[in-house]
Swiss-Prot record:
It comes from the Eukaryota. This is Novel plant SNARE 12. Residues 239-265 are vesicular. Expressed in roots, stems, flower, siliques and leaves. It is a single-pass type IV membrane protein. One of its GO terms (cellular component) is plasmodesma. InterPro entries: NPSN/SNAP25-like_N_SNARE (IPR044766), T_SNARE_dom (IPR000727). Keywords: Coiled coil, Membrane, Phosphoprotein, Protein transport, Transmembrane, Transmembrane helix, Transport. GO terms for molecular function: SNAP receptor activity. The keyword Transmembrane helix applies. Vesicle trafficking protein that functions in the secretory pathway. It comes from Arabidopsis thaliana.
Amino acid sequence: MASELPMSPHLEQIHGEIRDHFRALANGFQRLDKIKDSSRQSKQLEELAEKMRDCKRLVKEFDRELKDGEARNSPQVNKQLNDEKQSMIKELNSYVALRKTYLNTLGNKKVELFDTGAGVSGEPTAEENVQMASTMSNQELVDAGMKRMDETDQAIERSKQVVHQTLEVGTQTASNLKGQTDQMGRVVNDLDTIQFSLKKASQLVKEIGRQVATDKCIMAFLFLIVCGVIAIIIVKIVNPNNKDIRDIPGLAPPAQSRKLLYFRE
């Protein structure tokens, strides 16, 4: 059994993690058979693909540790460990092929929903994939599985780059919008200040207008008084014997004409 192989503690830890991933993959594919909704099946397949990528990373790490410890192990132990590595790679590739089969089956179901019967799809069916996998050698399965995983990793990296670029554009747009929002806030504050200044100026103009109107009324009243006094003076001068008009205080009455008296001898 694999657990009885002589391994270093770190190599044994990696081996245990790989086996845990294999059990999780087996359980995941069992649950996948019970799922009827295509969208949920797609989501489950994505989760299984993520576990396969982790498993592939662990297998590579297992291979590196194995190569680093070859000098410390006997040829027989190295052969057993290499056989275990090939067994894990083959098991991983079987899950990769199984996922591909489910993807093709799911794709065929979607095509059947929209197919008009005019043509035939060129994609291999699930049965063809199983037959193809059964005719391939272990090394061919390993190479095909690694190639498929590399293609998946490249697609994920491209998706990550697109997401990163989208985030950069979104961040730049948000920064520009924030700057424009701050500028609009300053403009609104300036408009409020101008409006307040205009209100104060309007109130000041009204106050000055009221003061000017009051001064004009006073000047007009004084002008009427002066005109009245002048009119009375003129009347007194023209008709000094008019008793209907009282004497103006401070104004001396007009001098009476003097008559010269002379005596006859």
